[in-house]
Amino acid sequence: MQYSKRYIISLSFLLNLSFGQNVILPGFFGEDLFNYIQNNYQASSTLGYNNARDVMYSEIDLKPGNQLTGVYSGYSITLDLSQDPSTNAYDQGINCEHTWPQSLGAGSEPMKSDMHHLFPTKSNVNSSRGNDPFADIPDINTDKWYKDDYYIETIPNSDIDEYAEKWNPPNQDDERFEPREQQKGDTARAMFYFYTIYENQAAPGFWELQEEQLIDWHFYDLPDQSEINRSNSIASYQGNNNPYVIDPSLVGRIFLIEEGTILGDMNGDNSLDVLDLIVSISYIIGQSNLDYNDILISDANYDLDLDILDIVILVNSILQ
């Protein structure tokens, strides 16, 4: 069948527009993509723990007015730049959180000083988290609610999303920690980063306790420009970005879709054809429902949604 040159040019133009974002290894899924990230996004070097903390406090996470904020509970200090950053922060109640706990694989180098999973936190909140897995804790189960420089032991009457939460059940192994809402996606992507890059050092079983929760948090709280800037700033020291920050589609493509999946293959017959387009179009016009995995399979421009631009790209793939 012949197609007009004008039609093909239009498709190519739309295809180029769709990939304006940073998409890592388009068309790959599952273990193949996981291994690629692991092999290509290692830090070329780290600063060592003391230097990493100093840089993080005084440069990476420092806000206007020399404000340094603990990510879990929102507690802020004014950092005195004439002093040693780590000492001055510590004296004011801020220390360094290893999002992946030191006792479970981050206790030696380069994991210990890799800034992609390090954050400033209020000291007592950091201690409360300990090496707990992350979770959405039912409000009735929360034992302590942390905000700014205080905690309460009853459900807050207002600003509930600004509190970090800790559950202390009788069995210590069941303890869980929940960051405040605005930190959840950042925490999830720090965890994805560590588990991918340092898979062989990560304690067995710890990841599985929270993988589904972290996937939810990632999609609930996608990277904003501040998080992207943070990743870029860290890359200027370590030589690597957090790939899950610069390409949010990776989480779904690696952890929800199996390797070997063909982009747009909605009916699982290992080919992309008109039948697959019918399924996708039916969803777009509201005639059918799809689970999120299926949406990601046909998300041809990797914007975490299924719309008409994806159809245009998939049609172009069929015509080629």
Which residue ranges define each predicted feature?
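Domain-level detector of nuclease and nuclease-like folds
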Residues: T87-N95, T99-E259
